[in-house]
């Protein structure tokens, strides 16, 4: 009896194991190794546009110094019989390298206009020269033609200013001796603009006093101070290596037939000069 119960228990246990083995079982979640996971596709980010590097501004090359030449205005005027009654030759400045010296164009244009004006004046003088010739012929007097010669020199030039000094010599019929005239111009070295007295000096009264004192002292004109003061004209100046040069025209003072000049150093005029 015991044996039957034992067998029954064993059978029941085996049956239970069998039923457990045959019953449904949960499949475990498949484990996925990290390498098997699909790599996330990176989201497309907009490409950053490169910031353009500003190119450095080109530094303009400094203007070259003027290369000086000359422009000549010349003509010979004759009477009806072919006799020369007037001869003129005006040699004026010409900047040859206007491509490298921008001021040169304006300077050249100024002197071209000056030369043209001189030629117009010469045509007017021609009529008087012919009249003088006719009178001389009728009276049996010797006749000498009038001649005019103009030359120039570059008196001063630096990065700021250019000064031109001109001389005009006139030998006229009936004159005891040739007449000499002095002219001058000062230009802005960068633009070629012609600069007058007020563009170079700041105090006309002080400049006049110093210039008059210089003429009186240098030429012993103590008794003619008033005449010097009246004769002085502010636009009659130019620059030189030694300083500012001022002049009086010939014939403006007793016994003075040709231009006279005085030079005031740059140091002595520093307080009344725009350019120091």
Question: What is the meaning of each model-derived region?
Answer:
Residues 18-21:
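C-terminal motif of bacterial Sec signal peptides marking the signal peptidase cleavage site
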């Amino acid at each position: 009896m015991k044996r039957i119960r034992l067998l029954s228990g064993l059978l029941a246990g085996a049956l239970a194991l069998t039923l457990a083995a045959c019953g449904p079982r949960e499949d475990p979640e498949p484990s996925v190794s990290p390498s098997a996971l699909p790599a996330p596709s990176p989201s497309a980010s907009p490409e950053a546009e490169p910031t353009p590097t500003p190119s450095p501004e080109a530094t303009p090359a400094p203007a070259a110094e003027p290369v000086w030449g000359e422009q000549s205005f010349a003509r010979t005027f004759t009477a009806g019989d072919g006799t020369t009654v007037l001869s003129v030759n005006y040699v004026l400045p010409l900047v040859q390298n206007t491509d490298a010296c921008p001021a040169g164009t304006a300077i050249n244009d100024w002197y071209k206009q000056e030369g043209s004006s001189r030629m117009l004046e010469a045509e007017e003088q021609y009529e008087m020269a012919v009249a003088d010739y006719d009178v001389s012929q009728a009276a049996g007097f010797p006749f000498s033609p009038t001649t005019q010669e103009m030359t120039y020199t570059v008196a001063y030039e630096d990065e700021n200013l250019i000064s031109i000094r001109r001389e005009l010599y006139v030998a006229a019929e009936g004159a005891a001796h040739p007449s000499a005239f002095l002219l001058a111009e000062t230009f802005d070295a960068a633009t070629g603009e012609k600069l007058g007295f007020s563009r170079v000096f700041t105090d006309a009264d002080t400049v006049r006093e110093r210039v008059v004192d210089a003429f009186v002292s240098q030429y012993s004109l103590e008794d003619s101070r008033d005449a010097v003061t009246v004769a002085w004209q502010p636009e009659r100046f130019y620059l030189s290596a030694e300083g500012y040069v001022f002049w009086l025209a010939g014939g403006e003072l007793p016994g003075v037939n040709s231009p006279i000049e005085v030079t005031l150093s740059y140091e002595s005029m520093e307080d009344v000069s725009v350019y120091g």
